[in-house]
C-alpha cells in the first residue's frame, strides 16, 4: 500500500499553527459529562467523522483493527491527540499498553515533555510487571469507588457515576477531579496469546469500571480467532482499517468490507447493531510541523464516482466556468 496525501490533523481544525488550535478554549467549553467527541477523519462526502465514547453515544468500549501498513498506529495516535486537543487532563486521561513496544507510548513524549493526558504506559514487560500494572489499575478503581461514595454521601444522590461526579467537580461541589480513564491496548491479540490471564483481568476491569469512567480500547493487526464472545459483548464500536482477510473484518465490524480497502488510513466504523456505519479516511498526525498564518486549502471541484469500498471508478473534472 502506498500512502496517498492525507489530511493533516491540523487541517481538520483549520489551524496553521499550534496556537490556532485554541486548546485552552476547547478545554473550557467542551463538556465531558455530555459528550466525548473526537474527530477521527472525514467521510466520502468530506464531512467529519467523530468517535464519541460517551456511554450514550459510541462507548464505552471498542475494537480497532488494521494489518501492517494499514495506518492503524497513526490512527490511534491521531485519536489520542484529538482527545487531548478537546478535553482537559482533568476530564480525560489515558493508559497506553504497547505490548510489542511498537513506539505508541513514545509518540507522546520528547525528553522530559509528555502529553499530560498520559498517566501511565505499559510496554515490553514480563508477567510480574504486567501483574503489578494490573494491581495498580485495580487500585485506581477502588479509589474511584471510595470517592464516588463520598460524593454520594455529601450530595444525597442515589447513585454516582463518572458523569455525575464530573458535573459535581465542574460545579465546585467536589474538589478532586476524576477523569475518564481510557486503557488503550495495542496488539492485544499477542498479549492475549502470551498472557491470557492478564487479558481476562483487563476485560473484567473494563466491565466493572464502566460506571467509574474506565474505557477499554483494544487494537490488533489480526483479530480473527482472538475476538471472543466476552470481548465482543463488551465492545460497542468497531473500527477496521485494511485487514488481511474477510474474517478479520467480520470480527470487528460484522461484515467483510474492510478486507477490500485500498488506501492507507481508510477505515470503516460500525457502532452497535449497525446504528452507525460509515467509510472514512483518517487524519494524519505524522506530517512535519510547518507553522503558517495562512491555511491553504486545495479545492477539488471534480466529481468522483466511487465503489462501496472507496475506490475511484471514474473522475470527471469540472470544466464549467
Say what each PLM segment does.
Residues 163-168:
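Disordered, acidic interdomain junction associated with two-component signaling
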Residues 306-309:
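Long intrinsically disordered, low-complexity regions that are acidic and Ser/Thr-rich
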Residues 2-12:
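Conserved small/polar residues in nucleotide/adenosyl-binding loops
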Residues 10-15, 320:
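Short glycine-rich, low-complexity/disordered patches
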Residues 3-4, 18-159, 171-251, 259-260, ...:
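P-loop NTPase catalytic phosphate-binding loop
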Amino acid at each position: 500500500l502506498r500512502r496517498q496525501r492525507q489530511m493533516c490533523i491540523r487541517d481538520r481544525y483549520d489551524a496553521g499553527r499550534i496556537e490556532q488550535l485554541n486548546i485552552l478554549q476547547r478545554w473550557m467549553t467542551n463538556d465531558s459529562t455530555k459528550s466525548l467527541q473526537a474527530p477521527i477523519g472525514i467521510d466520502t462526502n468530506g464531512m467529519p467523522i467523530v468517535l464519541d465514547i460517551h456511554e450514550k453515544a459510541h462507548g464505552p468500549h471498542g475494537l480497532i483493527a488494521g494489518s501492517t501498513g494499514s495506518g492503524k498506529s497513526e490512527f490511534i495516535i491521531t485519536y489520542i491527540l484529538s482527545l487531548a486537543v478537546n478535553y482537559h487532563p482533568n476530564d480525560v486521561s489515558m493508559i497506553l499498553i504497547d505490548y510489542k513496544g511498537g513506539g505508541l507510548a513514545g509518540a507522546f513524549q520528547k525528553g522530559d515533555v509528555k502529553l499530560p493526558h498520559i498517566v501511565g504506559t505499559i510496554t515490553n514487560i514480563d508477567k510480574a510487571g504486567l501483574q503489578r500494572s494490573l494491581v495498580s489499575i485495580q487500585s485506581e478503581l477502588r479509589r474511584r469507588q471510595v470517592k464516588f461514595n463520598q460524593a454520594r454521601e455529601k450530595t444525597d444522590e442515589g447513585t454516582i457515576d463518572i458523569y455525575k461526579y464530573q458535573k459535581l467537580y465542574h460545579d465546585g461541589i467536589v474538589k478532586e477531579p476524576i477523569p475518564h480513564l481510557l486503557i488503550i491496548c495495542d496488539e492485544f491479540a499477542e498479549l492475549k496469546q502470551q498472557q491470557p490471564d492478564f487479558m481476562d483481568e483487563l476485560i473484567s476491569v473494563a466491565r466493572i469500571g464502566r460506571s467509574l469512567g474506565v474505557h477499554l480500547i483494544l487494537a490488533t493487526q489480526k483479530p480473527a480467532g482472538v475476538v471472543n464472545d466476552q470481548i465482543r459483548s463488551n465492545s460497542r464500536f468497531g473500527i477496521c482499517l485494511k485487514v488481511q482477510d474477510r474474517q478479520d473484518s467480520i470480527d470487528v465490524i460484522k461484515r467483510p468490507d474492510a478486507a477490500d480497502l485500498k488506501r492507507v488510513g481508510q477505515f470503516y466504523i460500525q457502532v452497535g447493531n449497525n446504528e452507525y456505519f460509515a467509510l472514512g479516511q483518517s487524519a494524519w498526525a505524522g506530517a512535519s510541523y510547518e507553522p503558517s498564518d495562512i491555511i491553504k486549502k486545495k479545492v477539488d471541484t471534480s466529481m468522483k464516482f466511487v465503489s462501496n469500498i472507496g475506490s475511484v471508478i471514474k473522475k470527471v473534472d469540472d470544466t464549467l466556468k
